A protein has these predicted regions:
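Conserved beta-strand-loop surface patch within small alpha/beta domains used
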Residues: 1-45, 52-143
């Protein structure tokens, strides 16, 4: 799944958005919602998940991550300590940085807006697989 992080210049805080998206085991297709006015908000970072695979920047990521911003990928999300990789991009030049420079503190599992659950559509999913995904997203299995 994909999370967009915006900096609110007026209120001096970060705002998270889970855009509508279609996800498969290997890809995410989403659109920028347009509800964050560029006069007030800076699209600061994109975070996406590699689910239970390792956290790494793929060739697809290299091709897609064109904007000057921070990019993060989270992997091994079922592990007690998931993997996180972070980099800064500018004109297809990338510099990996320590994730602790970007992230501080941890939000408790399940502590997110309910509408995020309906923003992610799993391609080729069954009702059972969608329920399992939502349970993982909410942290109900101790994740």
């Amino acid at each position: 799944a994909l999370v967009n992080v915006y900096w609110d210049k007026q209120d001096s805080c970060f705002v998270l958005e889970v855009p509508e998206q279609k996800v498969t085991r290997t890809s995410i297709s989403s659109r920028i919602s347009g509800k964050f006015d560029s006069g007030r908000f800076i699209h600061y970072m994109d975070i996406h998940s590699h689910n239970n695979m390792n956290a790494f920047f793929s060739r697809t990521d290299d091709r897609d991550e064109k904007a000057a911003r921070v990019y993060a990928v989270v992997g091994r999300i079922s592990s007690f300590f998931p993997e996180i990789k972070v980099r800064i991009a500018n004109s297809r030049s990338f510099v990996e940085i320590d994730p602790s420079v970007v992230f501080e503190g941890i939000v408790a599992a399940g502590d997110f807006p309910e509408e995020w659950k309906t923003a992610v559509f799993l391609e080729n999913s069954t009702p059972d697989s969608r329920q399992e995904f939502l349970k993982q997203l909410a942290g109900s299995d101790g994740i």
